[in-house]
A protein has these predicted regions:
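Residue-level detector of Asp-centered blade-edge/turn motifs that repeat once per structural unit
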Residues: 20-23
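Acidic, Ser/Thr/Gly/Pro-rich low-complexity segments and short DxT(G/T)-type signature motifs
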Residues: 52-60, 77, 95, 132, ...
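Short, surface-exposed alpha-helix to beta-strand junction/turn motifs within ectodomains of secreted
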Residues: 71-114, 139-146, 155-159
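Short, small-residue-biased leader/transition segments that mark boundaries at the very start
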Residues: 1-8
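A short loop-to-beta-strand structural motif that recurs across blades of beta-propeller domains
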Residues: 44-46
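Conserved beta-propeller blade signature
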Residues: 25-29
């Protein structure tokens, strides 16, 4: 049985195929395909059954003209969420080239200059001093808890900013 806090490292091998049945059971087929992968097995077939328990997570990250808006699965602790030090960004991109792979290049450190927590405490709007089109914006969240005092299951989020929205 599983709740949504099952991570790829909890599975036997790298996930390759998923199948959801009518009763909500998920079958996960995995292989490392001769490469390094999460898990300790070269192949796996696992059955997961949903327990109905949703963890405290970042549900969505949306680009705004001056930053990002985060939606959470539960209300946040407004006091911690309002602190600038809770939110740390870095941004970077990769070299487009014909050979395989690329190092991260053009690292930048956007700073959060303003935090707005919605009345229902499920949405947090972060204003940044800079955003770079074409960059991956990597967010790390330090010490944020839900209003029910639960920690974030995953304290990072990534957004590839293909364009900066207008308006709002």
């Amino acid at each position: 049985d599983w709740s949504s806090d099952v991570c790829s490292s909890d599975l036997g091998s790298g996930t390759l195929a998923l199948r959801m049945t009518d009763d909500g059971t998920m079958f996960v087929g995995g292989t490392n395909r001769g490469w390094g992968s999460r898990g300790t097995k070269p192949f796996s077939l696992e059955r997961l059954r949903w327990t109905g328990k949703v963890p405290f997570e970042i549900l969505q990250m949306r680009a705004k003209p001056d930053g990002f808006e985060l939606e959470f699965t539960e209300p946040v602790n407004a006091e911690t969420a309002a602190q600038l030090a809770t939110w740390k960004f870095t941004s970077y991109c990769y070299i487009f080239q014909s050979s395989y792979g690329s190092p991260e290049v053009d690292h930048q450190q956007p700073e959060v200059t303003k935090v707005q927590v919605s009345d229902d405490r499920r949405t947090v709007r972060l204003t940044l001093n800079q955003m770079t089109r074409g960059h991956i914006h990597e967010l790390h969240v330090a010490g944020l808890k839900s209003a029910a005092d639960l920690p974030l299951l995953h304290d990072s989020a990534y957004y590839t900013l293909h364009y900066i929205p207008r308006g709002e």
